[in-house]
Regions:
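Conserved MFS/SLC helix-loop-helix module at the cytosolic interface between two early adjacent transmembrane helices
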Residues: 61-97, 271, 277
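A late C-terminal transmembrane helix in Major Facilitator Superfamily
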Residues: 330-362, 372
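C-terminal transmembrane helical hairpin of 12-TM major facilitator-type secondary transporters
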Residues: 274-320
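Extracytoplasmic gate region of multi-pass secondary transporters
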Residues: 29-30, 212-254, 261
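Juxtamembrane intracellular "pre-TM" segments in multi-pass secondary transporters
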Residues: 1-5, 190-216, 401
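Helix-loop-helix hairpin linking two adjacent transmembrane segments in secondary transporters
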Residues: 139-188
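Cytoplasmic helix-loop-helix junction between adjacent transmembrane helices
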Residues: 106-142
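Helix-breaking motifs and short loop linkers at transmembrane-helix boundaries and internal kinks
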Residues: 42, 74, 95-100, 243, ...
Length: 401
């Protein structure tokens, strides 16, 4: 296979893998949460938040695992391991009638999500020259956006004919995941296996070599705490607090997915032109504004806000990853990004449980979204503390992964 064709095929498979790991294995929970909560969890937002925390807590554990695996496996090898876990979790969620098994499924999908997500941006970024790294890392979010759109629209379609559809949606996603995992094992291969260098515990030894690593880690942590609140509770907020129908709430969630598809490309490309620091700061402020906009309950304002959420949902990580890629070569990328993702994972692990408890305490999700906006502004301050200029050390596009 020609090099150009192999790169296209590689991109297609890793983007589909990101869709399975993130959109299906993690963010579909936000779509099915009201149905699953009422079906298995006795309508408890606290329990639903705990289940969300189990998923992101497992994601946190996965970042530690992948930091260890990165020095022993190629990036492609990590993608395959993550796919096995994510697909297994989808299978459990598709057929269980027990809350404990659903919790286990979310844990497994959280592990798979981390193990896949860490290598995917690195593989995508190395397909492009250094001056296009922001655009390249934005591509990694395309698969996630497509998956979110699919989950939102499919949920709306299923609800038009059935009362309880959350497991039907998971079963459909399982079928897609089986196709993706088969494609990965057949077509996705490393030309020369070259594991990442060791980076200390959790990759933090390698991370400390990255310029502005403290500000970068703080920004990514703020993003992790804030985004999971908005993604997890937008549908519940609109249905429970604003009185929206499930179909209209699913439409709002779908607009997030459509915007995610383009958001990473747009924001990543902007960061190539005006710099990561300024772009990231503006993105965090925009996220805060959008979080507050969802609280209005007004259809036009909410739809504009969800579009903005979608753009920044993929745009903020694109700029963060581009900064990492600019300061790490292909062998140190795994440990470095694992370490930043570990901090991000800690923040998002505690966030859903806090949000669910606040919603039960206050009887609404209003304070939850104000909290998301406040933390986003903290992220903006951290982003503004980054050094102004990136230093490219990645070199030419490699031919191995």
């Amino acid at each position: 296979m020609a090099a150009a064709e192999r790169r296209i095929l590689t991109l297609a498979i890793v983007l589909a893998s990101a869709m399975v790991a993130q959109a299906f294995g993690r963010f579909t929970w936000g779509v099915v949460l009201p149905d699953a909560r009422d079906d298995l969890l006795d309508g408890s937002n606290t329990a639903a938040g705990l289940f969300g925390s189990l998923n992101v807590g497992a994601y946190l554990l996965g970042t530690i695992v992948v930091a260890w695996l990165a020095s022993r496996s190629s990036l492609v090898g990590l993608v395959k391991v993550g796919l096995v876990l994510s697909t297994s979790g989808l299978a459990l969620a598709s057929f269980t009638t027990r809350p404990a098994v659903l919790a286990l499924a979310l844990v497994i999908m959280g592990l798979g999500g981390a193990i896949i997500w860490v290598p995917v941006p690195g593989i995508a970024a190395r397909q492009f020259p250094p001056e296009r790294r922001g655009f390249a890392t934005g591509i990694a979010g395309v698969g996630i956006g497509v998956g979110i759109v699919f989950a939102g629209r499919m949920a709306a379609f299923l609800r038009s004919g059935e009362q309880d559809v959350w497991q039907t949606l998971y079963r459909i996603e399982l079928c897609i995941a089986l196709i993706v995992i088969a494609s990965a094992f057949v077509f996705l291969r490393s030309q020369r296996e070259r594991p990442s260098v060791a980076g200390g515990f959790g990759g933090f030894g390698a991370l400390r070599q990255v310029q502005g690593w403290k500000a970068l880690t703080g920004a990514y942590s703020a993003y992790g705490f804030s985004y999971i609140l908005v993604i997890s509770y937008t549908v519940a907020r609109l249905e429970d607090d604003a009185g929206w129908t499930s179909g209209r709430a699913a439409l709002a969630f779908t607009t997030i997915g459509f915007a995610v598809i383009a958001g990473g490309l747009i924001v990543g490309s902007i960061s190539d032109r005006i710099g990561r620091r300024l772009t990231m700061t503006i993105a965090f402020v925009s996220w805060a504004v959008a979080s507050i906009g969802i609280l209005t309950g007004s259809l036009p304002v909410v739809l504009v806000s969800t579009v903005l959420v979608g753009i920044m949902f993929s745009g903020i990580p694109a700029t963060i990853i581009a900064h990492v890629v600019a300061h790490a070569d292909e062998r140190s990328f795994g440990p470095v990004f694992s370490a930043t993702t570990l901090a991000f994972g800690i923040a998002q692990a505690v966030s859903p449980q806090i949000g669910g408890a606040i919603a039960d305490w206050r009887g609404s999700f209003t304070l939850v979204f104000w909290l998301a906006a406040a933390v986003a502004l903290i992220g903006a301050m951290a982003a503004w503390s980054l050094p102004e200029d990136d230093i490219e050390v990645g070199g030419d596009v490699p031919t191995d992964f």
